[in-house]
Curated annotation (Swiss-Prot):
Family designation: Belongs to the peptidase S14 family.
SUPFAM superfamilies, per the entry: ClpP/crotonase
Name this polypeptide is given: ATP-dependent Clp protease proteolytic subunit
Catalyses which reaction(s): Hydrolysis of proteins to small peptides in the presence of ATP and magnesium. alpha-casein is the usual test substrate. In the absence of ATP, only oligopeptides shorter than five residues are hydrolyzed (such as succinyl-Leu-Tyr-|-NHMec, and Leu-Tyr-Leu-|-Tyr-Trp, in which cleavage of the -Tyr-|-Leu- and -Tyr-|-Trp bonds also occurs)
GO biological process, any: protein quality control for misfolded or incompletely synthesized proteins
Cystine pairs: none
Main localization (coarse): cytoplasm
Superkingdom in the source lineage: Bacteria
Physiological role: Cleaves peptides in various proteins in a process that requires ATP hydrolysis. Has a chymotrypsin-like activity. Plays a major role in the degradation of misfolded proteins.
Assembly description: Fourteen ClpP subunits assemble into 2 heptameric rings which stack back to back to give a disk-like structure with a central cavity, resembling the structure of eukaryotic proteasomes.
Amino acid sequence: MITNNLVPTVIEKTAGGERAFDIYSRLLKERIVFLNGEVNDHSANLVIAQLLFLESEDPDKDIYFYINSPGGMVTAGMGVYDTMQFIKPDVNTICIGLAASMGSLLLAGGAKGKRYSLPSSQIMIHQPLGGFRGQASDIEIHAKNILRIKDRLNKVLAHHTGQDLETIVRDTDRDNFMMADEAKEYGLIDHVIESREAIIK
């Protein structure tokens, strides 16, 4: 199987001549961080590093975090979430396409009043998935841990949406897909936008 992981290059003209950037580095200059695809240790570490770098560059200037993700590893995603809460700059979150599972939690975890979605995007919340094989005692340990993780994720969603915990527990019991306007009504985002100008500066 052949995979194409080509990253586009942007040529920028400066006083000193031309300089080539990969597209993500060029976006980073505009304080834009992009999560595209699964949340895993690698993608999470890249996002965390970019967030910390942008804070060090200017702790008072907003960061724009674009999300198009089906979700992924809870531990990796919570590392990104905790970093978003830890750093000083407001992190604007913008859903383009899909923010599912851990992707939806990262979307909801943006700065209050600065969480956005494009109109055709979908947002999906659900409980964490788990599977483990081994001795019965080990399975029991992992089952207890996943219940603790589920409780933590539900509390985070309740905090950011304004929904009570009982509602979150019920609504995350199965895959729960929402269109952008429904996600706004639920409290996962603050604005449905159709143009860049609609993002609050």
